[in-house]
Amino acid sequence: LAVALICIFLFANGIPAMREIGFIKFITGEIWRPNSEQFGILPMIVGSLYVTAGAIIFGVPIGILTSVFMAMYCPKQIYKPLKAATELLAGIPSVIYGFFGLVVVVPLIREFGTALYRAGLVSKPGNGNSILTASLILGMMILPTIIGTTESAMRAVPAHYYEGSLALGATKERSIFRVIIPAAKSG
């Protein structure tokens, strides 16, 4: 209900402004200066797409490999704490992830950029507030979902798929990556 009311409020107040400046100009405008009545959101849209793509590039491989470990390799005494840790990560509010990013990740990226600058590999050191930082944090945020869904999908694959692959001479790794994961994609 609260989200619906927020959306109604935003649209009710935003539609007249979009009519005045034009929807296409609003979407494709490159400058956002409300005081000068310039309302372009293209850089925000492109930035969101970059951050999302970066998060997928970081989060999906790590999440799938963690799921493979948990479903196929993890000893029972390690599985329970690891499963609890991934479930705990899912319960952390996004504000806490953002705070962690500002306090920990931004300084690390800043130091990394400074090291690259000193080595002469980049022209400016940067301040750490970047698409890379946002992608890393968002990638961390999506890990619990990817790990949970991938692991449960892998466990749902019938055992005879895996056993049949091993019986045909495939290694354990090849059986996992060429049989189990493709079969789990539907889940």
Where are these regions (language model features)?
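Transmembrane alpha-helix signature in integral membrane proteins
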Residues: 41-69
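Membrane-helix/interface signature in polytopic inner-membrane proteins
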Residues: 150-163, 171
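N-terminal signal-anchor/first transmembrane alpha helix
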Residues: 1-8
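Residue-level signal for discrete positions within transmembrane alpha-helices
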Residues: 44, 48, 84-87, 91, ...
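Membrane-interfacial helix termini and adjacent extracytoplasmic/periplasmic loops
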Residues: 20-39, 99-140
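Glycine/proline-centered hinge or cleavage motifs at structural transition points of membrane proteins
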Residues: 93, 168-169, 182
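Cytoplasmic-entry segments and transmembrane alpha-helices of multi-pass inner-membrane transporters
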Residues: 62-101
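Alpha-helical membrane-protein architecture signal
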Residues: 38, 42, 46, 78-82, ...
